Amino acid sequence: MGAVSDVLVMSDYTRMRQWSLAIGVAIVGVAILASQGYIDTSKSIYTSNRFLYLSTIIGSLCFGFGMVLASGCGSKTLVRIGGGNLKSVVVFFVLGLVSYMTLKGFLAVLRVNTIDTLFLPLSTTQDLPSILATQTNIAKAHLQLILGLLIGGAFILFALLKKSFWQRDNLLAGGGVGLAIIAIWWISGYLGFIAEDPKTLEEVFLVTNSGRMESLSFVAPYAYTLDWLILFSDTSKVLTLGIVAVGGMIIGAFLSAILTKTFRWETFHGVEDTGNHLLGACLLYTSPSPRD
């Protein structure tokens, strides 16, 4: 949101280039992991063979509006909590509640029986290499590497074209996020993967709540974090990648705020401000598809 506003209001592409660098590094890294057989992206939670087009459209619109009203997305909320923002603490709990309702509660039933019934069935998983592999004679692994290098390289090129962008903070911000995403894919899809669970004799991904391969996500893990805290005495509730990432973001943001002396308490400025943040928190996970 901040990157888009910088471009539209000030014609400043610095943060947009940071995002572009992060996206490019992540795409290239994941493509290399997949092409070398370390992970299988077709087994991730994001690549089913059903394209839920209406859920995706409505969810994206809700998320966009919610992000503006709540002063940021799920990850930004965690950063603001670490910096002393009490408004974001409220957003965290409301968003966690609504996300749980959307995953397993009232909104889940509504979602599954309405807009999730509208989808496009695909003959393969919905990642681009799998789709193109069925249309060409090129092996999927080769397509993963080629497309990853081309698309990811284009994002990296856009970021680095501006010489003024070549500063340590910009490169660390973009490159660091991209490398973190690659690391999470590796942990989720390779390190935490068992080809045959002794109990079920089926393959399993150990470190995620969904039981499938995931990358960094900061909305559904809100619900999982609250669930873990509320049912802490239940030994079946274990720390997962998403829950640890939520805690790590808050702790990291807090330490950064202390070291840079930017930590300060902040709260709502009035009824309108409170209402906007509450509505924004609800919209952030009134996205029908539980894939975030």
For every predicted segment, state its role.
Residues 104-158:
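Long hydrophobic alpha-helical segments that form multi-pass transmembrane helix bundles
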Residues 1-10, 264:
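Membrane-interface helix-loop junction between the first two transmembrane segments
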Residues 40-54, 255-280:
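Membrane-embedded helical hairpins/re-entrant loop segments and their flanking transmembrane helices
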Residues 66, 70-120:
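Membrane-interface helix-loop-helix junctions at boundaries between adjacent transmembrane segments
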Residues 168-266:
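Transmembrane helical segments that form the transport core of multi-pass membrane transport proteins
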Residues 285-290:
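Conserved small/polar residues in nucleotide/adenosyl-binding loops
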Residues 3, 38-49, 109-120, 127-135, ...:
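Membrane-interface helix termini and inter-helical loops of multi-pass transporters
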Residues 18-26, 30, 55-62, 66, ...:
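Alpha-helical transmembrane segments in multi-pass membrane proteins
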